[in-house]
């Protein structure tokens, strides 16, 4: 009887090796592909746990899609899978599904808010999900496609150059319906991407010789909140708008697109949107005025809006706004200054905890022709004052009232 049992166990083991061997080889090969593409910075195990990571994993065969540790930052790596290819029905049988990116600050990369013809909302009426703070004691954000984190590093060097901060991003590439739910990532993918971003940044910090490390990523990251919503419900980055009851003015937005506040973030935004009915009522009220004869009625949801940003720290030094003249270089706001970019962009500045902050306002095309200048100024001042108070900022500089008038 014992001999029979031993034979059965041996046969079972052989069968396990027979069936498991190809899977083990596929996993080993996938890990090799991830390490080769991402310079050993991106942890392979949580990447392979992502929803689109099934099947065969490969990476882009070019310098622009691989991380090379001895080259300048920023860099990124791009991974492909047959699982993503099959679900999306690609002709090649594979599809780009993951991007890991790393970088350092200070950087010369321009930071640009929306211009007047950009859209804040999905033009087809689907929900819009503004990024939220990551939480967990980590300076970072969660978007509808990935997670970005940041770490101070005053004692490190990247490719021989001193740095002040490092950052890392882990994201899915246009996950779409096969790998998302109602326009959002699956909860398991949000958590995995946060883990990947944090571990990638810690690996980069070790390579750069930084002393500090990030704590473990949160393990139960909440879903993003869909927007826009009525201004009466604002309790985050647009709470100031509700408290001032600006929405009671028919010429101002009645909806908000906001996130939770986090005073440590490099970019914090409040979006103010005119709902479809209010936008059309406002257009009808000015359509007969010859001064507004070139203003067309809004043709899509959320087309008329005001977007407000606060850029902090190193990022504030790289803000660029469109200039009034088409042939002129971009306007580069500096700490201690305030003014106007093109006809629909303004900036203010302040100093918070010894670090520069640049505050910007963009008014969308069309709406910039009908919003009264004094109301635009009042909005911007109220926004900047709120942020400055919340962040204990000083030396706040506002644009002159004349900067809000076009004539």
Language-model regions, residue ranges each:
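Generic structural motif
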Residues: 82-84, 105, 154-158, 171-177, ...
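Flexible, solvent-exposed loop/hinge segments that line or gate ligand/substrate-binding clefts
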Residues: 260-347
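Short linear interaction motif-like sites in intrinsically disordered regions of transcription factors
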Residues: 19-20, 29, 97, 168, ...
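Hydrophobic membrane-insertion alpha-helices, especially the h-region
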Residues: 2-23
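Extracytoplasmic low-complexity, Pro/Thr/Ser/Ala/Gly-rich segments
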Residues: 21-113, 212-291, 374, 388-407
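Short, low-complexity intrinsically disordered segments
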Residues: 16-17, 26, 94, 165, ...
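Long acidic/polar interaction regions in large eukaryotic complex-forming proteins
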Residues: 106-136
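A short, solvent-exposed beta-edge/loop patch
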Residues: 130-210, 315-407
């Amino acid at each position: 009887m014992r001999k029979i049992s031993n034979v059965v166990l041996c046969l079972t083991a052989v069968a396990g090796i027979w069936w498991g061997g190809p899977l083990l080889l596929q996993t080993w090969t996938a890990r090799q592909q991830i390490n080769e593409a991402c310079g050993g910075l991106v942890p392979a195990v949580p990447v392979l746990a992502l929803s689109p990571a099934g099947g065969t994993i490969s990476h882009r065969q070019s310098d622009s899609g691989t991380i090379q540790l001895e080259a300048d930052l920023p860099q990124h790596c791009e991974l492909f899978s047959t699982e993503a290819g099959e679900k999306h029905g690609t002709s090649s049988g594979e599809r780009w599904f993951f991007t890991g990116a790393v970088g350092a600050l200070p950087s010369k990369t321009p930071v640009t808010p929306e211009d007047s013809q950009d859209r804040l909302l999905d033009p087809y009426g689907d929900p819009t999900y503004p990024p939220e703070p990551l939480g967990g004691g980590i300076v970072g954000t969660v978007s509808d496609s990935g997670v970005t984190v940041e770490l101070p590093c005053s004692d490190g060097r990247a490719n021989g150059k001193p740095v002040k901060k490092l950052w890392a991003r882990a994201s899915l590439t246009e996950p779409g319906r096969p790998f998302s739910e109602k326009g959002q990532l699956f909860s398991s993918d949000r958590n995995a991407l946060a883990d990947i971003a944090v571990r990638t940044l810690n690996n980069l910090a070790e390579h750069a010789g930084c002393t500090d490390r990030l704590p473990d990523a949160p393990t139960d990251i909440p879903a993003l909140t869909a927007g826009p919503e009525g201004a009466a419900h604002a309790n985050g980055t647009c709470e100031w708008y509700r408290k001032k009851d600006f929405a009671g003015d028919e010429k101002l937005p009645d909806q908000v697109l906001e996130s939770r506040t986090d005073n440590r973030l490099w970019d914090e935004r409040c979006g103010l949107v005119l709902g479809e009915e209010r936008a059309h009522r406002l257009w009808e009220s000015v359509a007969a005025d010859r001064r507004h004869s070139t203003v067309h009625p809004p043709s899509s949801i959320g087309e008329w809006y005001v977007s407000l940003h606060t850029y902090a720290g190193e990022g504030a030094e790289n803000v660029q706004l469109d200039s009034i003249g088409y042939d002129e270089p971009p306007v580069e706001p500096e700490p201690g200054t305030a003014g106007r970019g093109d006809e629909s962009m303004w900036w203010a500045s302040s100093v918070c905890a010894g670090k520069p902050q640049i505050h910007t306002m963009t008014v969308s095309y069309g709406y910039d022709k009908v919003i009264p200048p004094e109301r635009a100024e009042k909005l911007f001042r109220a926004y900047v004052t709120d942020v400055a108070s919340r962040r204990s900022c000083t030396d706040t500089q506002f644009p002159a009232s004349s900067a809000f008038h076009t004539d």
